[in-house]
Amino acid sequence: MTKAPVAPVVLVILDGWGYCEETRGNAIAAAKTPVMESLWTAYPHTLIHTSGKAVGLPEGQMGNSEVGHLNIGAGRVVPQELVRISDAVEDGSILSNSALVKICQEVRNRNGKLHLVGLCSEGGVHSHITHLFGLLDLAKEQRISEVCIHAITDGRDTAPTDGINAISALEDYINHVGIGRIVTVSGRYYAMDRDRRWDRVQRAYDVMTQDGVGDGRKAVDVLQASYAEGVNDEFIVPVRIAPGTVEPGDGVIFFNFRPDRSRQLTQAFVSPEFTGFARQQIKPLSFVTFTQYDSDLSVSVAFEPQNLTNILGEVIANQGLNQFRTAETEKYAHVTYFFNGGLEEPFAGEDRELVSSPMVATYDKAPAMSATAVTDTAIAAIQKGIYSLIVINYANPDMVGHTGQIEPTIKAIETVDRCLGRLLEGVSKAGGTTIITADHGNAEYMLDEAGNSWTAHTTNPVPLILVEGEKVKIPGYGTNVELRSDGKLADIAPTILDILQLPQPPEMTGRSLLQPAEYEVELSRTPIPVGLN
């Protein structure tokens, strides 16, 4: 007997598509988006919060893709690593952190150097410079004789030239605490690649590991010289400015807390079977990462991962239902690893498909990215008729928005809008329901108040639109579904469970965005478990 095809819930995450009524510097407002505009007019919609305490960050802190997908998938507000580590610095408990104290002892016993590696930024997305200050306090208390700082500059989650302020603050703190020196400087474009562009990573790695006394400049001089040549923080070419090579017997603390852009450089240091580029592994080398970048890495972890249970993917799997995730390279980890609460392995019945991002230096050169291929992949999954939940991420608004180039970002937005129209046709034919939303803002605010380019995320809310399939009514809510106006990302998973008529576990503390209504239900839809993959 042939089983009826499943009418799926399709969650579409428009990465970096925020909401802002101001039109100046707003690539979304400037773009032609007939699909999104018609959906906003015709279907239930609301705005939801994606920053600050609504996603487990400090008040006023902008959200990001990792935090956004983690909250969406968990169905609860997840306290973020930024808060956990900042609290440890503020209350002094970082000074007694067992992994950090141990590496200091090992370095001291071997008479080695302690290397502090990470993004020197106040962005709070991958790191925070106050965490580096806490490590300098630790090194002083542990009587480390030589502390070498390998500064990575931001310019992506901060203004393009904010790095000089961060580096100046770091120099001031070094003078205050009386320990440490900046020995290398590298833009995150090189040191924090996540797309296996190993030639970039190698340039940062070589500067850190090859012998040399440096050119004697101060770090702020390096930045000023780069700015004069039109090269901003993100793209600072790796350079050594003082002695302090990573050598056998040394220790490294990588103080980024976000894993995705920290894995590759870490692999270059510690993976015995590393093949990204030719290098001689440094042994012995003590290595601590602030958080768990990858469970397969041979490192110590200062702040162990939080254990999240009964997240959305797990609930779907435990019900015997199938699910599908797809995104292009830039956001694939977000719809898989982060969406699943930091778990690498898929749940039972969870299929995934990676679409390769175009190999370009920056995405303003290819604003369409791989959105068409992502759409094709999603439609093919819908047509299989076996998935109860399909999760899709369109990377364009965020990745092109980060370049600060408005015209290419407009093209990126328009590409996504066209793809969305085609995707919705596929969902409609399958009788499915689509939730369209975003993980954080970006492309809606690309100029600051002074008219300068803004390349970071925003604290703006994001849209959420609920699109029911034709002749398919959400059980219990009837034809005139309304959405709450005070929602947050943690409410999306309960909303999906509500639509699928699945029980919400107690660990999932978000609330469905669907407003109860007193209507006659014309046609209910119950998901049908299908054991085909």
Swiss-Prot record:
Sequence positions that bind Mn(2+) 2: 15, 65, 439-440
Reaction(s) the record says it catalyses: (2R)-2-phosphoglycerate = (2R)-3-phosphoglycerate
Pfam families cross-referenced by the UniProt entry: iPGM_N, Metalloenzyme
Keywords carried by this UniProt record: Glycolysis, Isomerase, Manganese, Metal-binding
Function: Catalyzes the interconversion of 2-phosphoglycerate and 3-phosphoglycerate.
Protein name, entry field: 2,3-bisphosphoglycerate-independent phosphoglycerate mutase
Listed pathway(s): Carbohydrate degradation; glycolysis; pyruvate from D-glyceraldehyde 3-phosphate: step 3/5
Protein's organism: Nostoc sp. (strain PCC 7120 / SAG 25.82 / UTEX 2576)
Lineage of producing organism: Bacteria, Bacillati, Cyanobacteriota, Cyanophyceae, Nostocales
Cofactors demanded by this protein: Mn(2+)
Family assignment from sequence similarity: Belongs to the BPG-independent phosphoglycerate mutase family.
EC numbers: 5.4.2.12
Active site, UniProt feature: 65
Free-text remark on how the cofactor is bound: Binds 2 manganese ions per subunit.
Self-association and partners: Monomer.
Binding site for substrate: 126, 156-157, 188, 194, 258-261, 331
GO molecular function terms attached to this record: manganese ion binding; phosphoglycerate mutase activity
Binding locations of Mn(2+) 1: 398, 402, 457
One GO process term, biological-process aspect: glucose catabolic process
UniProt GO cellular component terms: cytosol
